[in-house]
């Protein structure tokens, strides 16, 4: 499968990208981002959620494992204020990432890594809200 950027979805990472604008609006409303928030987005994909949250917060970073998506995201002019990190989130410690605390964590997480990410978050509970 491909989408409008011609990015080939990578099965090994369980990639799926948000495209439904109504769903994205609901997610942003649920997140309720504020001007004081520092946000870490896990798996930004093509940046559909990123582009809606970024203008509403003080600081935003997004961690993405796919090098092709990192290149694409870094090339988007509308996302220049977001700090993109090319790493596997499960191999990171929140306090080592360049993000002010406390951190709010958001993401469209693939099913195949939901449990590992939840356990990763629990281990690092002191660093996020």
Residues covered by each model-derived region:
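Catalytic cores of RNA-modifying enzymes
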Residues: 1-129
């Amino acid at each position: 499968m491909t989408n409008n950027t011609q990015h080939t979805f990578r099965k090994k990472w369980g990639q799926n990208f948000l495209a439904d604008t109504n769903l994205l609006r609901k997610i942003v409303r649920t997140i309720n981002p504020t001007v004081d928030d520092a946000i870490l987005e896990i798996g930004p994909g093509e940046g559909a959620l990123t582009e809606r949250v970024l203008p509403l917060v003080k600081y935003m970073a997004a961690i993405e494992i796919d090098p092709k998506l990192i290149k694409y995201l870094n090339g988007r002019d509308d996302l220049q204020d977001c700090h993109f990190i090319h790493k596997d989130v499960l191999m990171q410690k929140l306090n080592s990432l360049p993000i002010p605390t406390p951190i709010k964590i958001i993401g469209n997480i693939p099913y195949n890594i939901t449990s590992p990410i939840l356990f990763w978050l629990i281990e690092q509970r002191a660093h996020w809200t």
